[in-house]
Amino acid sequence: MIKDVENANAEFYDAFENVSINMMENIWIHNDNCICIHPGWEMIVGWLAIRESWMTIFTNMKNFKFTITNTKTRLYEDVVGVLTCVENIQMIQNERKVHTGVVATNIFEYDYNQKRWLIVYHHGSPVSDYLPPANSY
């Protein structure tokens, strides 16, 4: 089951890299209880507001490339999966290549109707004094 949570996490970052709101919609739970905290943003509550935040991000930033490191995954009662990781990100922002690091916590809930893990919480915090890992890009 841990591998299933890690696969759901990979789907989340695939959606990000592909700048795909459709893929992002597929991995998030659609209710008013989900939460997203992007680095430097206020807390966003509810799927519709979270969807709008992804639309804004996808409009302003392109060509995301993620290298995920330092992954730690835990399961609670086979219903909740918590994954922490470092997002090593390369992107194009305002015509410039940018490298940044974000420590992320992604919480997944098992959806028995869909028989899969869906993200219910994402929190990203910037890494100060970030140095990308060797060979990450």
Question: Which functions belong to the PLM regions below?
Answer:
Residues 1-26, 33-137:
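A beta-strand edge to alpha-helix "cap/lid" segment located at domain peripheries
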